[in-house]
């Protein structure tokens, strides 16, 4: 039996504060969270996989109590996963891949809908993460450190992809899903002159200690990317911990300037 939960952890771009956190906010099967702060409101969605309608969007004003507001993907379009929910120039977007190996985007002028039909993007990879570069152009990161340029409306690819990040090399003796780093889930933000990218490594469904969240920063979306000396920011070090396979996180700031990371995990023994 698998029991995936979403958890929240207080985070300070380098220093973790562990008081009453981490705290489970979504007990149940809600993997691959993506969270957005829009003024005093927070919105979040997650992987629907084979469920339709998909991309259930949740709303909160305190990051702890949530209520559903809409489903952004009304019809089944293949197993949809690992979304990136964002707002850019007044419009909301969800970028996501499917089991077909393709990437799509949907958009809406109101987060409660109506949402557009999926627009196919000519980009390979999984777990897309949107960012606006230092040149004012829009880009999409995908797994394994690749970046692809987008059109101004964010609905088309305008150039070739290139690799700009190699990930954080975790210790060779750590027990993870396999020999591959499984560098995925790039989620980006810009703060005080730096781009920060939180990524997942180690594999999602491997041993209890496999998954993790790592952070790198750069002055440019094209790098060089400097890995945090505090990596991994989130990780299960032992199968004796309450939460297994913690990872796939998204950073978000609250209205008071505090920073948090929302990520998924398995309850101990329910993997």
Predicted regions and their residues:
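Carbohydrate-active catalytic/glycan-binding domains of CAZyme proteins
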Residues: 19-271
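Sec-dependent N-terminal signal peptides
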Residues: 3-13
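Short glycine/proline-enriched turn or capping motifs at secondary-structure junctions
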Residues: 2-3, 271
